[in-house]
């Protein structure tokens, strides 16, 4: 049976890209999916049965490597986390929240800071470039871009080949503008910042995977849920690469790096090996997880 990847889901139809035959098949789901409570997602690898050259039925959904609830997409290889230098203001707390979420899902993060052309005063630019160095030192890929000038895009595009990539980030940071600059044929709608609220309006309605630069890219509505619902206390440290690396030297196994004695992570913070603001965010997120209502 032929196989392909679902690149769009709309009104009960699933559009399957069969690269071996270089065509897209419009498929319906079978009742067995509803019976087994399986919802096919954009990004799923699917086995299908063709009725003709253009239409068919989904028969099976292959096992997923990961699955995001919002946006509903699966088998994501990497996420370009788009944050603006200004309008809205750059936030390391929000960036770290996104990083934790993608790391927890086994997705490779790429950080993109856009609108650098709007950070007019030298102090703002200097502060942001300092953060860029911090995140690069941790091991993250970080790119500084200006969508209007099309600068800094080459570095991001080189990551797309043979990958499924999502763009995510705070509303109003220019995700659609950035994708339009990368692939002008997308013609994705963009909205200016709402002057009343100081934040952007979501302009993307549904998730669709689009061929560009040798890979598949989704312009998503961003993560509308930023809660750590699937992350347990003992798992949080593994989503901070620098904590994950140093925690092996903690005296106690299962150290949460809070009040435990002889904690290598706390020592690394004191000695400047781990940025204090990253550790503060770790503690904030840990508290959030601890206060989460028990799940039954």
From Swiss-Prot:
Ligand binding (GTP): 114-117, 169-177
Free-text comment on the cofactor: Binds 1 zinc ion per subunit.
Residue positions binding Zn(2+): 250, 255, 257, 263
Membrane spanning residue stretches: none
CDD domains: S1_YloQ_GTPase (cd04466), YjeQ_EngC (cd01854)
Localisation: Cytoplasm
Cofactor(s) for this UniProt protein: Zn(2+)
Any single Gene Ontology cellular-component annotation: cytoplasm
InterPro entries: G_CP_dom (IPR030378), NA-bd_OB-fold (IPR012340), P-loop_NTPase (IPR027417), Ribosome_biogen_GTPase_RsgA (IPR004881), RsgA_GTPase_dom (IPR010914), RsgA_N (IPR031944)
Keywords noted in UniProt: Cytoplasm, GTP-binding, Hydrolase, Metal-binding, Nucleotide-binding, Ribosome biogenesis, RNA-binding, rRNA-binding, Zinc
Gene Ontology terms describing biological process: ribosomal small subunit biogenesis
Broadest EC class assigned to this enzyme: hydrolase
Subunit record text: Monomer. Associates with 30S ribosomal subunit, binds 16S rRNA.
Protein's job: One of several proteins that assist in the late maturation steps of the functional core of the 30S ribosomal subunit. Helps release RbfA from mature subunits. May play a role in the assembly of ribosomal proteins into the subunit. Circularly permuted GTPase that catalyzes slow GTP hydrolysis, GTPase activity is stimulated by the 30S ribosomal subunit.
Assigned protein family: Belongs to the TRAFAC class YlqF/YawG GTPase family. RsgA subfamily.
Cross-referenced NCBIfam families: ribosome small subunit-dependent GTPase A
Protein name: Small ribosomal subunit biogenesis GTPase RsgA
Natural source organism: Bacillus velezensis (strain DSM 23117 / BGSC 10A6 / LMG 26770 / FZB42) (Bacillus amyloliquefaciens subsp. plantarum)
Gene: rsgA
